[in-house]
UniProtKB/Swiss-Prot annotation:
Originating gene: rpsJ
Keywords: Ribonucleoprotein, Ribosomal protein
Keyword Transferase recorded: no
Name of the featured protein: Small ribosomal subunit protein uS10
UniProt signal peptide: none
Free-text function comment from the UniProt entry: Involved in the binding of tRNA to the ribosomes.
Organism from which the protein derives: Mycoplasmopsis pulmonis (strain UAB CTIP)
GO biological process: translation
Family of the protein in this entry: Belongs to the universal ribosomal protein uS10 family.
Subunit: Part of the 30S ribosomal subunit.
Database matches in NCBIfam families: PRK00596.1, rpsJ_bact
């Protein structure tokens, strides 16, 4: 019997949204009795943008903004086509990007 794995990666700028989406998927997995490993928190990507406050003069006066990307990773063992179809139809919170990979 060939073992199939489904890897899901969640990304968002808000860590609460990522955690809600992961929780929703894990509830579905426990209802369908699917074995999984995770959620594994992946490193947070931090981007800093520096812009001038004034358009004209005052080069030393600058403002910095930060954007963080939070990521989580889950692997499902032998998910089955029914579970994959349920996941595809599941609505995730707005602002969460979900990536599927079947191995």
């Amino acid at each position: 019997m060939k073992k199939e794995k489904l890897a899901m990666k969640f990304k968002s700028f808000d860590h609460k949204l990522v955690d809600d989406a992961v929780k929703k998927v894990l509830i579905l997995a426990s209802k369908e009795k699917i074995d999984y490993s995770g959620p594994i928190p992946l490193p947070t990507k931090r981007e800093i943008f520096t812009i001038l406050r004034s358009v004209h003069v005052n080069k030393k006066s600058r403002e910095q903004f930060e954007r963080r990307t939070y990521k989580r990773f889950i692997v499902f063992n032998n998910p089955g086509p029914k579970f994959v179809e349920i996941l595809k139809r599941t609505e995730m919170p707005a602002g969460v990007e979900v990536e599927f990979k079947v191995k």
